[in-house]
Amino acid sequence: MTRKSFSIIAGALAAVLMPLTSTTAYAQGMLTEQNAKTIKDVELSADIVVAGGGLSGVCAAVSAARHGATVILVQDRPVLGGNASSEVRMGIVGAKGDQNAEAGLLEEMQMRNFRFNPLLRYTLWDDAIYSTVVMEPNIKLLLNTSVEDVVMDGDRIAAVKAWNINAYTRYLIKGTIFADCTGDGILRLSGAKYRHGRELPSEFDETFLDEGGDAKTMGNS
């Protein structure tokens, strides 16, 4: 091997190994002091904190905001809508029967979608949900933000801790009322009672429900 060819090979290996060495150092925590300087800690508060930005969380947040409450809506994805968003594409399929349709806020979002998205593109459907939320002045929306823990005051939730890895931001979000609309029961971290599966139709007098009382669950986004 000539000196020239050795230099070329050594340079190529250095180029490959340098990022690997940096990645290993990061994984081993060698850069934590530097990273800590870039992490922002933000404290927020609202009347109602909604965890989960699927359709249930969106409807809860918008309804509360229109009744005068201040709301913080925390969604761990870059879009709203959950299983009905462009990420999963289940759509709105809750109404049972050929002649039945969704009403209320769901119908409002669908009408906005039909008006501005006649070809029913899922990416524009995301915009219809998003605009419904951001047009409400009482709602603060946190996308790409995951609830990871709760802060208890006795037997009540005083705050939730959340993390946005894209913005390197940690949130402490205080509230009076907390709504778990994640679909995953994340606020069970508080020790609150929760259930897994479907309830019996008779439990809440759900006349349109013809089955239940089992361990079936939906997928999630």
Indicate where each model-derived feature is located:
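N-terminal Rossmann-fold NAD(P) dinucleotide-binding loop
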Residues: 57
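Glycine-rich loop(s) and the adjacent beta-strand/alpha-helix scaffold that form part
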Residues: 180-221
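Beta1/beta-strand and adjacent pyrophosphate-binding region of the FAD-binding site
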Residues: 40-54
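Bacterial N-terminal signal peptides that target proteins for export
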Residues: 1-12
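Short hydrophobic core segments
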Residues: 51, 173-183
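Conserved N-terminal/central alpha/beta ligand/cofactor-binding core
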Residues: 27, 37, 45, 63, ...
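Bacterial N-terminal signal peptides
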Residues: 10-22
